[in-house]
Curated annotation (Swiss-Prot):
Membrane-crossing residue ranges in chain numbering: none
Span of the annotated motif Cx9C motif: 30-40
Gene3D superfamilies: Cytochrome c oxidase, subunit VIb
Pfam families: COX6B (PF02297)
Subunit structure: Component of the cytochrome c oxidase (complex IV, CIV), a multisubunit enzyme composed of 14 subunits. The complex is composed of a catalytic core of 3 subunits MT-CO1, MT-CO2 and MT-CO3, encoded in the mitochondrial DNA, and 11 supernumerary subunits COX4I1 (or COX4I2), COX5A, COX5B, COX6A2 (or COX6A1), COX6B1 (or COX6B2), COX6C, COX7A1 (or COX7A2), COX7B, COX7C, COX8B and NDUFA4, which are encoded in the nuclear genome.
Gene: COX6B1
Record protein name field: Cytochrome c oxidase subunit 6B1
Cellular component terms per the entry's GO annotation: mitochondrial inner membrane; mitochondrion; respiratory chain complex IV
Cross-referenced PROSITE patterns: CHCH
Protein family (similarity comment): Belongs to the cytochrome c oxidase subunit 6B family.
Span of the annotated motif Cx10C motif: 54-65
Role noted for this protein: Component of the cytochrome c oxidase, the last enzyme in the mitochondrial electron transport chain which drives oxidative phosphorylation. The respiratory chain contains 3 multisubunit complexes succinate dehydrogenase (complex II, CII), ubiquinol-cytochrome c oxidoreductase (cytochrome b-c1 complex, complex III, CIII) and cytochrome c oxidase (complex IV, CIV), that cooperate to transfer electrons derived from NADH and succinate to molecular oxygen, creating an electrochemical gradient over the inner membrane that drives transmembrane transport and the ATP synthase.
Entry-annotated residues carrying N-acetylalanine: 2
Pathway(s) the chain acts in: Energy metabolism; oxidative phosphorylation
Organism: Bos taurus
């Protein structure tokens, strides 16, 4: 168990610098990467491609976004009331 945690800590990567979002407030960065992940996932699924290429966006938004925001956005996408264009 402790070895698993140590391995996760060793392999953990945070979001890299993105020059589109140079300021300290990363809210827009979080939102954009959430949208980019779901757009990429939708496009790759439609093409029959490998969705794993979208994993970078997922890792970034999981690192930046609060869990409550992500769960709310996921719920709204499921209900069809999500405000973003995916």
């Amino acid at each position: 168990m402790a070895e698993d945690i140590q391995a996760k800590i060793k392999n953990y990567q945070t979001a890299p610098f993105d020059s589109r979002f140079p300021n300290q407030n990363q809210t827009r960065n979080c939102w954009q990467n959430y949208l980019d992940f779901h757009r990429c996932e939708k496009a790759m699924t439609a093409k029959g491609g490998d969705v794993s290429v979208c994993e970078w966006y997922r890792r970034v938004y999981k690192s930046l976004c609060p869990i409550s925001w992500v769960s709310t956005w996921d719920d709204r996408r499921a209900e069809g009331t999500f405000p973003g264009k995916i």
